């Protein structure tokens, strides 16, 4: 059977609805919708093993922030997006204690660079609190890591993060990475927040060891941005939307290639979203306004 690929819980929920019918209630899963700063947020809570089996994801809370309107560049679009991201981070992380932000991915591969780019916009304070307490004693200790990828470092991201967690003892790890979506309309237009952790490289089809509470011993907030669509999944959706017959999907099942589709202007989109996520994390962790974050990072 051809399986449509997605890393987004909201899309896994949609796929289940398509197969089971919208009149059937999905046991073990609760879905709610709201708006924050004018941006829609869909929350999918997987409550038990029945929900895990239905959606193929571990139990926990998955929140999808829809930033489609961000690209329309309306009034206050950046500040509102930063606060919307920050609000999710605030609600899903402890309100005190040191924080380790991990920018996962390959900076040299544009669709996979959202993690390192987000880390570039993080306000690093851990070393400053001890060095200049008169200026930074009121800040929360934050450190950042860009572990790179196994092919260029020879070290698994999970190994590097685990070693640093053992040394720093953070209250939470915030891991930012690229994801894969099933729909082009969600690429670079959504941000998923999950308290279940993340598998580095999943967005570009290069699964590595997981980063979660079980492997690191501390809570892990995963922040993911879909930057690619699996080509076979995209083709399957297009075939179905065109009302083509089921046998046409057999061609997709037999294709061995692993191809990804990404927007033409992915460079700019990833840079913009990396900054929004980095600023959102700063806004959530520090008692600062966006203008103050700008000044401190300049």
PLM segments and residue spans:
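N-terminal amphipathic/basic leader segments beginning at the initiator methionine
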Residues: 1-59
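Conserved active-site and cofactor/substrate-binding residues in soluble primary-metabolism enzymes
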Residues: 60, 76, 80, 84, ...
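Short glycine-rich or small-residue beta-strand-to-loop segments that form or flank ligand, phosphate
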Residues: 66-68, 98-109, 144-148
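Gly/Ser/Thr-rich loops at beta-strand to alpha-helix junctions
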Residues: 104-112, 151, 178-182
């Amino acid at each position: 059977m051809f399986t449509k690929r997605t890393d987004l819980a909201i899309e896994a929920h949609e796929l289940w609805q398509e197969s089971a019918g919208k009149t059937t209630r999905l046991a073990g899963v609760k879905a709610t919708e709201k708006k924050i700063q004018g941006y829609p947020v869909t929350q999918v809570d997987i409550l038990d093993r029945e929900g895990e089996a239905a959606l193929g994801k571990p139990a926990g809370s998955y929140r999808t922030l829809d930033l489609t309107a961000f690209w329309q560049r309306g009034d206050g679009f950046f500040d509102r997006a930063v606060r919307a991201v920050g609000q999710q981070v605030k609600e899903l992380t402890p309100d005190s204690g040191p924080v380790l932000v991990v920018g996962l991915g390959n900076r040299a591969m544009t669709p996979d660079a959202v993690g390192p780019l987000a880390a570039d916009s993080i306000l690093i304070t851990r070393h400053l609190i001890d060095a200049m307490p008169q200026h930074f004693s009121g800040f929360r200790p934050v450190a950042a890591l860009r572990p790179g990828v196994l092919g260029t470092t020879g070290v698994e991201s999970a190994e590097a993060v685990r070693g640093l967690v053992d040394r720093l003892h953070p209250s939470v790890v915030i891991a930012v990475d690229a994801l894969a979506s099933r729909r082009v309309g969600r690429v670079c237009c959504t941000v998923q927040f999950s308290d279940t952790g993340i598998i580095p490289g999943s967005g570009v089809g290069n699964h590595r060891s997981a980063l979660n509470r079980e492997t690191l011993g501390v809570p892990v907030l995963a922040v993911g941005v879909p930057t690619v669509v699996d080509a076979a999944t995209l083709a399957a959706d297009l075939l179905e939307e065109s009302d083509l017959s089921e046998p046409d999907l057999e061609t997709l099942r037999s294709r061995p290639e692993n191809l990804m589709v990404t927007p033409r202007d992915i460079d700019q989109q990833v840079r913009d979203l990396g900054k929004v996520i980095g600023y959102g994390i700063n806004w959530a962790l520090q008692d600062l306004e966006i203008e103050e974050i700008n000044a401190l990072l300049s």
